[in-house]
């Protein structure tokens, strides 16, 4: 009886601590989750991101005289994108773009197997275009622990799924193209098109679109004005991916890969454009303090 009594007492103590600590652990976990995900943007914030768009000075006939900006970024609509840009981005960055809902588990599994078992890292990180767009909301420069990185990755996944539920694929692609940094003070595809080729995104050829898309993940390494040889190799890789994904025929691929990269390179700044005296006077007027 004494042994039974002692065993019963231990069970009572054990269940007491379980019942006592479980709510505390749950509350702590809930508070930690609220803290960890507190900065996940709302739908309104996703709808109206702080993109630091440039102020464009436009003449009466519709010509852009100059821009004033912190980041050289101008918005374009989906209809203003060359189809070659969209095709190149899908072929290179997210071949299953129209088949997943923000996270492509099939691609993640493939990348994991090839990276760990075959040692092949050429498949990239398995991030979808929607995930890459979400990454711009969570800077990683100051992250110095694996634990924080896991939290950030989880928040990126949640944000990516949230975007997929609220936007069409075309809207997501448009956001992506407007958000990418291409180096050379070019933020977004419009600034990049004008900086490197002196034209609007809708007018880009296949080889020009492939050059810009090739810069997405490493804008300095594959900058055609800085590293023309590396840029050409990368551009031709993008073109080959377009052929593999059915956007180009084999003959088109082989022909386009022979075309050299021809730039119309000009970094866009406040001094670029026509009517310099008018622009300077306008800048002074805009920056002048309102009299008290």
Language model feature labels by segment:
Residues 249-292:
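Non-catalytic structural connector segments
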